[in-house]
């Protein structure tokens, strides 16, 4: 059984509240879970201590026993110092697309040609 530490949504319409739960990876988001491990209230201020509440001892126990936290939960655990989150590095994502690179090269070529023509005209 693959276990995930993930968020289960609660609260009412446009007033989200999430429980940090341990659940089988195949169960629905708000479905059956094995243990409630904390909560997250995104409506509270970011510096409020009640915004994210975690049971660090139980979370460590379940991670040692093979449970995988989701990306969002891993961010909370990293902030709390419970688990380490590796920073994602994708330098290719920052590059413009192929056609944009071609257009930039054409524009640079036009600028270079114009500068050369201006230099010839000045002589």
UniProtKB/Swiss-Prot annotation:
Q: GO terms for molecular function, please?
A: structural constituent of ribosome
Report the InterPro entries cross-referenced here: Ribosomal_bS16, Ribosomal_bS16_dom_sf
Q: Which UniProt keywords apply?
A: Ribonucleoprotein, Ribosomal protein
Compositional bias (Basic and acidic residues) spans?
99-110
Keyword rRNA-binding annotated: no
Which stretches does UniProt call biased (Low complexity)?
111-123
Would you say which domain of life the source belongs to? Bacteria
SUPFAM superfamilies for this protein: Ribosomal protein S16
GO biological process terms held by the UniProt record: translation
Q: List the disulfide bonds.
A: none
Q: Does the keyword Cytoplasm apply?
A: no
Output the Gene Ontology cellular-component terms: cytoplasm; small ribosomal subunit
Ranges for the region named Disordered are 85-123
Q: Report the sequence similarity comment from the record.
A: Belongs to the bacterial ribosomal protein bS16 family.
PANTHER family according to UniProt: 30S RIBOSOMAL PROTEIN S16, SMALL RIBOSOMAL SUBUNIT PROTEIN BS16M
Record protein name field: Small ribosomal subunit protein bS16
Query: Which organism is the protein's source?
Result: Rhizobium leguminosarum bv. trifolii (strain WSM2304)
Q: Lineage of the source organism?
A: Bacteria, Pseudomonadati, Pseudomonadota, Alphaproteobacteria, Hyphomicrobiales
Q: Which gene is the coding source of this polypeptide chain?
A: rpsP
């Amino acid at each position: 059984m693959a276990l995930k530490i993930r968020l289960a949504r609660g609260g009412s319409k446009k007033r989200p509240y999430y429980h940090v739960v341990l659940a089988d990876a195949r169960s629905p988001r708000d479905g059956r879970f094995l243990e409630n491990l904390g909560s997250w209230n995104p409506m509270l201020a970011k510096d409020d201590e009640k915004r994210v509440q975690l049971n660090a001892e139980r979370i460590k126990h379940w991670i040692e026993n093979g449970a995988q936290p989701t990306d969002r939960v891993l961010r909370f655990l990293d902030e709390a110092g419970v688990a380490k989150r590796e920073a994602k590095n994708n330098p290719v994502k920052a590059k413009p697309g192929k056609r944009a690179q071609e257009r930039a090269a054409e524009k640079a070529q036009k600028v270079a040609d114009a500068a050369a023509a201006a230099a010839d005209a000045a002589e």
